[in-house]
């Protein structure tokens, strides 16, 4: 209430008239901390204790303005005990907030938002799992016993290899490199072809050993040609007997 209203209210009544002096007396039952008792009424000489002093008892020094002003004494409710001035014990109020987490008290909305965000992320991860990255070592490896595809040679490559085989059934490393480069093959492919060709020659001539020199090979070819007419005559004789 403004000071003008208070002054006009008190000017209508004199000391001791119609209103008892005890009506405005309000004192604390206990004097805690050696603080003076707050008394309102005509006996106090028109002065009373500033509310900032009462606030200092609970919250320490006040940063509010301490300019003197007058206040209606009826606006202040006195219950006898300064500890119950606000209706509850300040010590209990402090212990109530001290028992909780200060972060939850100050940032309750943030905590709840963060918790809800984490819950949504967990649900999203369960519904749509992220694709796993496949590393080279995680891919299925080829079977150890798997055979490679059979190499096919063109007519030109086969003709050139046959010529080289008739000239020399065994190739040196240098000659093998030259043949492989000329035919567009690898050294391993040329080597395997010559091995297979020698095995084929042994089966055709019924020999356990392939001739190591060219002279031996020529002699074997001559013997084969000599045996050819004899084999033809024997075949004709067998056909005549059957008839």
UniProtKB/Swiss-Prot annotation:
GO terms for cellular component: chromatin; nucleoplasm; nucleus. A motif (Antp-type hexapeptide) lies at residues 134-139. GO terms for biological process: adult locomotory behavior; anterior/posterior pattern specification; dorsal spinal cord development; embryonic skeletal system morphogenesis; grooming behavior; negative regulation of myeloid cell differentiation; regulation of transcription by RNA polymerase II; sensory perception of pain. Residues 203-243 are annotated as: Disordered. Keywords: Developmental protein, DNA-binding, Homeobox, Nucleus, Transcription, Transcription regulation. Sequence-specific transcription factor which is part of a developmental regulatory system that provides cells with specific positional identities on the anterior-posterior axis. It holds the Pfam family Homeodomain. This is Homeobox protein Hox-B8. It is found in: Nucleus. Gene3D superfamilies: Homeodomain-like (1.10.10.60). Forms a DNA-binding heterodimer with transcription factor PBX1. InterPro entries: Antp_homeobox_TF, HD, HD_metazoa, Homeobox_Antennapedia_CS, Homeobox_CS, Homeodomain-like_sf, HTH_motif. CDD domains: homeodomain (cd00086). Residues 146-205 bind DNA. It comes from Homo sapiens (Human). The lineage of its organism: Eukaryota, Metazoa, Chordata, Craniata, Vertebrata. GO terms for molecular function: DNA-binding transcription factor activity, RNA polymerase II-specific; DNA-binding transcription repressor activity, RNA polymerase II-specific; RNA polymerase II transcription regulatory region sequence-specific DNA binding; sequence-specific double-stranded DNA binding.
């Amino acid at each position: 209430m403004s000071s003008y209203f208070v002054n006009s209210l008190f000017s209508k009544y004199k000391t001791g008239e119609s209103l008892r002096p005890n009506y405005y007396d309000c004192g604390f039952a206990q004097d805690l901390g050696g603080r003076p008792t707050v008394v309102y009424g005509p006996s106090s000489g028109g002065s009373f204790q500033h509310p900032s002093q009462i606030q200092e008892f609970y919250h320490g020094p006040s940063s509010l303005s301490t300019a003197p002003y007058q206040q209606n004494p009826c606006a202040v409710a006195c219950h006898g005990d300064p500890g119950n001035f606000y209706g509850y014990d300040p010590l209990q109020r402090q212990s109530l907030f001290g028992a909780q987490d200060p972060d939850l008290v100050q940032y309750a909305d943030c905590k709840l938002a963060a918790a809800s965000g984490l819950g949504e992320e967990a649900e999203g991860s369960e519904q749509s799992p992220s694709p796993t990255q496949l590393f080279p070592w995680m891919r299925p490896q080829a079977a150890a016993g798997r055979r490679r595809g059979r190499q096919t040679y063109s007519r030109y490559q086969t003709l050139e290899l046959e010529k080289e085989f008739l000239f020399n059934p065994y190739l040196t490393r240098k000659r093998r490199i030259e043949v492989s480069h000329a035919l567009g093959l690898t050294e391993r492919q040329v080597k395997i072809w010559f091995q297979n060709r020698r095995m084929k020659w042994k089966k055709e001539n019924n020999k356990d050993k392939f001739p190591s020199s060219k002279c031996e090979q020529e002699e074997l070819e001559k013997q084969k040609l000599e045996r050819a007419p004899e084999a033809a005559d024997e075949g004709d004789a067998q056909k005549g007997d059957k008839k």
